[in-house]
């Protein structure tokens, strides 16, 4: 037992526990976030006697007489100061790391009035941010120092909320001050805790499940198995091939497969009870990777499948083989890219309870509340489910699949009790789908002027233990493997294989990150072979408005690849002239689902009793700032002002289904739906006031029409729009480390330029990790890394100068010309870095993470 002070108040911790658990579970100070519980991420940072400390490390018995400060304990001046500074700098995206960053800022500024940039970077060195790339957080610290010194905090200059304005995001204050709720921040009366007992073998037959001892343990509410599921057992984003609970006689597919759900009154009892569930297995040989999966006599990951092929794609246009044979210059290379973990700061969590209407209400952190609703209804065999999105602490594609939401819904449905189901960080690293590793063989042919004549490729990937989005990822990898260039001879074959490894699925870039590394690396090598610069070969081949991509689509006037090349040229020329090692790469990425699949945006504008317009769209805000985008869309397309508008977080009973927050689609697709609703509202406002419109609903819907892959039309429209980018990397010749990155991105109409810059900076740093040192090793038992701190993520003091340049290219006739930017920010970075290292030491690197660099992690 210990007595100490929290935010100036004396408190007593009767049992010895981590400070994190005491602050959250007993005092419910939920600004202190639980990101890893292993002392790695920094999301739980507090101040102890004025010094930063990760609250998951110290035990309460060691804190006798100490003074602890959380964000809740800041002075009113400090709360206003940090809210303004972080909002003005554009430093807030998903927000999960921000309270910890704020306390690091306070600790620094309490000691140093005018900190240097090095001191600012050092102050947050122990705190990860996966969204921002740290650039704007450092700017926020700098601004906070200036304002604190001046003693005056201005009001945000946000009179104009129209498209193109760098306004503060809607959710800045609740994220900076930590009162906004993520699912784990809910503590409901009588709430129980649930967790799954998972397979001990990557591939085994479950022969028996003995739950008797676990059920008999005092404090255990229920132990559920497959026999208790009232609806269908299997779930899946596209294909229902993932057991919610493995039945007796069922086959496990990876170490994350759930077998039983334990529900208890408290977390300590929960962990004890899980150990009392006894599962009898018949271990079977596992499939460790695609090379094994290909073999005719390989074990089948799924009994019901003929082989281990999860998806096959073939894309062909023109005569690639003939064009390459006729080319003056030909290069062929093999490339490999690794597994990558999303490393979002917020582990998966869901809370469920019975609401006042008798529905199971799920409070979720996911990328589509309506997808969660669909899966839960199938599992329960009931329509009495509602899903309410909470704040989402990062996604990047990793929260598209079911992990905990359906389990929480099942527990509440069967027990009638409120429940919280949360993954530990080790479970999160195991369970949600990762970025696919790819193995790729590419051949490119060019004429004497460097004009691409043809490209031919063959790729395969490890999609792991279930389908997830493996097929669409493979398809996108193949359709974008040609690069953003104007030529017509292209062919690629792609295969995704089931294995008993953890599943792979959506990850920022959606397969394009992998094939872009190959095609852009080949283009850099080809430029050298011909004797022209990497910039020149791209400029000669760049797709321009009215031209055909290799998939046959004629691009529109909004196409801005040339503009990105022209904008980067002065920086590129200056680096070359200075004799610096510099690498260049370009990319394109679709905005919207495309390829003939359903791709809809829906939005309701409802005038409510407060005489304000409330925006309802069933689309998750996962850090990209969708709510702010939609408010700016309404201000731009109606006579209303910012104060007339309220953004409502996604739910499934009022907000219409707007599809997943993936595919860089929400700004364009749901943005256009919102614009259409605005047209109707504007017309109504010509004759009536908002008070007179009380209760009126203005509905907008947009269905993006595209052609299926392989459609028999001369110029298939694969996607409504593409974003384009060119990035360059400059190395310090002495240290071999990255000196700077310049990233130029075409976003159509920039809705919020500062927010766009933040997306770019975050994507660059994320792919620096992908290119240089992040790792997700999997051992011979198909078991992956289980420590967040060992992933190899970049920290604030390690990042180079990053210059983000936003190119405004009008022309798209939907969503006021706005194109999504979420994914393309991370796509060209790796090949640009690889080329810079070639310029440094003459070594062509074709495997990621790159070898023989100062960033290489030994013993990988």
Q: For each of these PLM feature ranges, what is it?
A:
Residues 145-307, 414:
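Flexible, low-hydrophobicity surface segments
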Residues 258-259, 264-266, 417-464, 671-691:
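Phosphate/diphosphate-binding loops
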Residues 90, 165, 171-177, 238, ...:
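Glycine-rich loop/linker segments at domain edges
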Residues 124-183, 565-570, 574-578, 604-613, ...:
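Intrinsic disorder at enzyme termini
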Residues 226-227, 381-383, 414-419, 448, ...:
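C-terminal catalytic domains of large/alpha subunits in multi-subunit enzymes
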Residues 1-156, 595:
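Signature of N-terminal electron-transfer/Fe-S-associated modules in redox systems
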Residues 46, 174, 180, 349-354, ...:
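Short beta-strand elements
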Residues 296-378, 542-612, 692-717, 787, ...:
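Helix-loop-helix junctions that connect adjacent transmembrane helices in secondary transporters/permeases
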């Amino acid at each position: 037992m210990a007595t100490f002070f929290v935010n100036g108040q004396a408190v007593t911790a009767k049992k010895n526990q981590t400070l994190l658990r005491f602050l959250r579970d007993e005092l419910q100070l939920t600004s202190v976030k639980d990101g890893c519980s292993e002392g790695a991420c920094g999301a739980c940072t507090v101040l102890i006697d004025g010094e930063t400390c990760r609250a998951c490390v110290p035990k309460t018995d060691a804190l006798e007489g100490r003074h602890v400060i959380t964000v809740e304990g800041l002075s009113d001046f400090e709360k206003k100061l940090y809210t303004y500074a972080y909002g003005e700098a554009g430093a807030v995206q998903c927000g999960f790391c921000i309270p910890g960053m704020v306390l690091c800022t306070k600790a620094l500024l309490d000691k140093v009035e005018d900190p240097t940039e090095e001191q600012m970077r050092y102050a947050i060195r122990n705190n990860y941010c996966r969204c921002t790339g740290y650039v704007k957080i450092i700017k926020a610290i700098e601004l906070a120092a200036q304002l604190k010194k001046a003693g005056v905090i201005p009001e945000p200059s946000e009179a104009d909320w129209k498209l193109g304005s760098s306004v503060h995001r809607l959710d800045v204050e609740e994220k900076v001050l930590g009162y906004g709720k993520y699912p784990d921040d809910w503590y409901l009366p009588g709430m129980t805790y649930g967790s799954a007992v998972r397979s001990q073998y990557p591939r085994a037959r479950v022969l028996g499940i003995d739950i008797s001892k676990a059920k008999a343990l005092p404090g255990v509410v229920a132990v559920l198995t497959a026999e208790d599921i009232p609806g269908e057992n299997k779930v899946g984003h596209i294909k229902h091939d993932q057991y919610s609970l493995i039945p007796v006689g069922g086959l496990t597919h990876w170490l994350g497969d759930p077998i039983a759900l334990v529900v208890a009154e408290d977390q300590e009892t929960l962990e004890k009870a899980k150990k009392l569930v006894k599962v009898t297995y018949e271990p079977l040989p596992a499939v460790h990777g695609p090379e094994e999966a290909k073999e005719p006599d390989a074990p089948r990951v799924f009994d019901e499948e003929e082989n281990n092929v999860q998806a096959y794609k073939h894309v062909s246009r023109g005569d690639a083989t003939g064009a390459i044979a006729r080319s003056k210059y030909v290069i062929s290379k093999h490339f490999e890219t690794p597994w990558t973990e999303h490393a979002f700061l917020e582990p998966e969590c869901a809370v469920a309870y019975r609401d006042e209407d008798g529905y199971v209400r799920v409070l979720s952190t996911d990328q589509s509340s309506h997808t969660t609703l669909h899966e839960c209804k199938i599992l329960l065999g009931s329509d009495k489910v509602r899903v309410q999105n909470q704040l989402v602490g990062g996604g990047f594609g990793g929260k598209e699949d079911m992990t905990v939401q359906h389990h929480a819904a099942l527990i509440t449905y069967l027990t009638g009790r409120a429940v919280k189901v949360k993954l530990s960080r080790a479970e999160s690293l195991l369970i949600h789908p990762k970025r696919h590793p790819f193995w790729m063989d590419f051949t490119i042919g060019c004429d004497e002027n460097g004009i691409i004549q043809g490209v031919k490729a063959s790729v395969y990937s490890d999609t792991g233990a279930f389908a997830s989005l493996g097929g669409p990822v493979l398809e996108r990898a193949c359709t974008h493997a040609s690069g953003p260039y104007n030529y017509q001879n292209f062919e690629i074959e792609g295969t995704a294989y089931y294995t008993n490894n953890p599943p792979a699925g959506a990850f920022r870039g959606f397969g394009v990150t992998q094939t872009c590394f190959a095609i852009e690396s080949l283009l850099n090598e080809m430029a050298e072979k011909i004797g022209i610069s990497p910039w020149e070969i791209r400029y000669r081949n760049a797709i321009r408005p009215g031209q055909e991509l290799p998939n046959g689509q004629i691009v529109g006037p909004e196409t801005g690849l040339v503009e990105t090349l022209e904008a980067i040229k002065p920086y590129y020329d200056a680096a070359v002239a200075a004799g610096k090692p510099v690498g260049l790469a370009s990319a394109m990425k679709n905005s919207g689902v495309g390829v003939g699949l359903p791709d809809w945006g829906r939005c309701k504008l409802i005038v409510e009793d407060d005489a304000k317009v409330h925006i309802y769209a069933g689309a998750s805000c996962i850090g990209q700032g969708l709510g702010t985008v939609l408010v700016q869309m309404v201000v731009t397309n109606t006579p209303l002002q910012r104060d007339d508008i309220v953004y409502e977080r996604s739910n499934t009973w009022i907000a219409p289904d707007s599809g997943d927050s993936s595919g860089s689609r929400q700004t364009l697709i749901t943005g256009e739906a919102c614009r259409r609703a605005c047209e109707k509202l504007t017309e109504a406002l010509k004759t009536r006031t908002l008070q007179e419109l009380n209760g009126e609903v203005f509905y907008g819907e947009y269905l993006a029409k595209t052609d299926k892959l392989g459609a028999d039309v001369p110029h298939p429209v694969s996607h409504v729009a593409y974003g384009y980018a060119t990035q360059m990397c400059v190395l310090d010749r002495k240290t071999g480390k990255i000196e700077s990155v310049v990233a130029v991105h075409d976003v159509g109409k920039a809705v919020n330029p500062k927010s766009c810059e933040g997306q770019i900076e975050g994507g660059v740093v994320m792919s620096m990790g992908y290119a240089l040192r992040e790792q997700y090793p999997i051992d011979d038992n198909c078991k992956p890394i289980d420590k967040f701190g060992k992933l190899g993520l970049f920290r604030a003091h390690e990042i180079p100068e990053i210059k983000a340049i936003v190119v405004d290219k009008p022309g798209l006739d939907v969503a006021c010309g706005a194109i999504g930017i979420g994914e393309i920010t991370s796509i060209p970075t790796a090949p640009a870095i690889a080329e810079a290292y070639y310029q440094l030491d003459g070594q062509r690197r074709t495997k990621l993470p790159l070898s023989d660099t100062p960033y290489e992690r030994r013993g990988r």
